[in-house]
A protein has these predicted regions:
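Conserved acidic segment of CheY-like receiver
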Residues: 4-24, 59
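Conserved active-site segment of CheY-like receiver
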Residues: 12, 91-95, 115
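Acidic, metal-coordinating helix/loop segments flanking the phosphotransfer/catalytic sites
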Residues: 36-58, 122
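C-terminal output helix
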Residues: 42, 116-127
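Active-site residues of response regulator receiver
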Residues: 61-62, 92
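Receiver (REC) domain active-site loop signature in two-component systems and cognate sites
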Residues: 65
C-alpha cells in the first residue's frame, strides 16, 4: 500500500481543482498526494493504469465535464470489481435533487454542492478526511 493517501480531484476547472486541494491541505498536509484530472475519460485511464502503489484512497468528482462526464465515470467505477471500493465524493456546483439522486443511484458515497466560501470548503474537506482518510501512522 502507498505511503501516502492519493486523492484524485476530477474537475475540468483548474481553479476549482486547486481550491479543493488547498482546502484539504489547510489542515491535512501530511500523507496526502493530490492528483488533478480533467475529465472522466482521463480518470478511468488513470485507474486502469494505476498499480497498488498509485491506487487512490478517494476520488472527488465533478459531474459536468467535457468528454466522459462525472455520471458516466461514476457508473463505470462502481460497476468495476477493481474500483468500486474507492470512496467517491461527487463535488459539484449542482444543487439539483435529480443530480443528487442519480449520483447516489450510481454509487456515490457522498454528494456535496460546492460551497460559496473557502471556510465552508475547509469544513467539508475536514469531514471527508475524518470519514474516509484516517491518519496513517
Amino acid at each position: 500500500m502507498s505511503e501516502k493517501h492519493i486523492i484524485l480531484i476530477v474537475d475540468d476547472d483548474l481553479d476549482d481543482r486547486e481550491i479543493i486541494r488547498d482546502a484539504f491541505m489547510s489542515n491535512h498536509k501530511n500523507h496526502r498526494e493530490y492528483i488533478f484530472i480533467e475529465n472522466g475519460d482521463l480518470l478511468l485511464q488513470y485507474l486502469e493504469e494505476a498499480d497498488n502503489e498509485n491506487s487512490p484512497a478517494l476520488i472527488m468528482l465533478d459531474l459536468n465535464m467535457p468528454g466522459k462526464d462525472g455520471r458516466e465515470a461514476l457508473r463505470e467505477i462502481k460497476e468495476s470489481e477493481r474500483f468500486r471500493h474507492i470512496p467517491t465524493v461527487v463535488f459539484t456546483t449542482s444543487s439539483s435533487q435529480k443530480d443528487m439522486q442519480v449520483s447516489y443511484d450510481l454509487g456515490a458515497n457522498c454528494f456535496i454542492t460546492k460551497p460559496d466560501t473557502f471556510n465552508k470548503l475547509v469544513e467539508i474537506t475536514n469531514s471527508i478526511v475524518q470519514l474516509w482518510l484516517p491518519d496513517k501512522n
